[in-house]
């Protein structure tokens, strides 16, 4: 059984440590949390506590297929990280660099439309209504410095 062990497993453009459990290893992929990794293990009938270095190549391909199209495998929409996409209106799940680019595009769209959230992002201030009297003083916001 030692011959089948892989120290690095490549899943969706990400090298994952083979010594970790399947559940933990899947959470190393950006865009995959613990609930999605648990659901993926249950969908594929994999032991979530087994080391990912021992799983077969076919199972790795199935994991990648679930990450590409989770709705095909009846993953609920509330587990997806991009529900009702702004441009397409579809429910999709993004991982790794696709997630980064989409979030950056969303921020740029908010800044371009000069929405409240966009202006707060531009100024480097908190966006979600936190108080700023005593906190966020060391952030890199643009302002006047006293000498």
Curated annotation (Swiss-Prot):
Annotated region described as Disordered, given as residue ranges: 115-147
Gene Ontology biological process terms, A to Z: translation
Entry keyword annotation includes Plastid: no
Signal sequence, renumbered to the chain: none
Sequence ranges of Polar residues compositional bias: 132-147
Gene3D superfamilies: 1.10.8.50, 30s ribosomal protein s13, domain 2
Quaternary structure note: Part of the 30S ribosomal subunit. Forms a loose heterodimer with protein S19. Forms two bridges to the 50S subunit in the 70S ribosome.
Family: Belongs to the universal ribosomal protein uS13 family.
Name of protein: Small ribosomal subunit protein uS13
Annotated source species: Methanobrevibacter smithii (strain ATCC 35061 / DSM 861 / OCM 144 / PS)
Protein encoded by which gene: rps13
